[in-house]
Amino acid sequence: MDIKINGITVGNDAPFVLFGGINVLEDLDSTLQTCAHYVEVTRKLGIPYIFKASFDKANRSSIHSYRGVGLEEGLKIFEKVKAEFGIPVITDVHEPHQCQPVAEVCDVIQLPAFLARQTDLVAAMAETGNVINIKKPQFLSPSQMKNIVEKFREAGNGKLILCERGSSFGYDNLVVDMLGFGVMKQTCGNLPVIFDVTHSLQTRDAGSAASGGRRAQALDLALAGMATRLAGLFLESHPDPKLAKCDGPSALPLHLLEDFLIRIKALDDLIKSQPILTIE
């Protein structure tokens, strides 16, 4: 089942779509700088592109951690991104009252993993009629995603994308079950499945409120996931990850973006040049 976003086809058998950008909006200049580089690289490589950023990181571990520029300022920045680059935008919401204002600016609304079972939020998101990206919670199995999908459908919106972002593996660690991509496709009617490689690289340190990360393994993990015939890749970057205000240890350094995507596209082209082989 394919989803259309401003002329971009998102489907498991279509060329992969990049949902990429920054973790959280820091200011207008850095946002435009990052987006401009993504646009330049993806146009050069012929990769469909949707810009990603959060206006608010509402689930930070510490009350003192940076959260973002807020809804009002965030929507102004997204409007400038769309006006300057002519590309679709995806962002996440955390409360029902945010859904309609976000839907008026952004093309895709994201349901955060920690909030994926919140019925009031699901209903408000569904009511917008926008395409929805559902992050798979770390605490749910891939097959349980069908319950969230059904909730959206019964609320009136079947324009859904499913996003893997790792599963809890004991304490303070995430792993990605590569078999889970196929399970989500099979149990959810072959909805588009994308892979958030950035957040799958997170680690936790019991002595710190900040997340750690393993960005050195980003390419290995991304290639492994994309080999399962996915609709897209979800990727966060930063011009200088050491200075990022959120999740810097998992962010891909912006200057490596082109070399990274060359490898992802080569694999995606190879996988999708072959017919699906069904093994019973």
UniProtKB/Swiss-Prot annotation:
The keyword DNA-binding does not apply. InterPro entries: Aldolase_TIM (IPR013785), DAHP1/KDSA (IPR006218), KDO8P_synthase (IPR006269). Its EC number is 2.5.1.55. Pathway: Carbohydrate biosynthesis; 3-deoxy-D-manno-octulosonate biosynthesis; 3-deoxy-D-manno-octulosonate from D-ribulose 5-phosphate: step 2/3; Bacterial outer membrane biogenesis; lipopolysaccharide biosynthesis. Its main location: cytoplasm. Signal peptide: none annotated. Belongs to the KdsA family. NCBIfam families: KDO8P_synth, PRK05198.1, PRK12457.1. This is 2-dehydro-3-deoxyphosphooctonate aldolase. It comes from Neisseria meningitidis serogroup C / serotype 2a (strain ATCC 700532 / DSM 15464 / FAM18). The gene is kdsA.
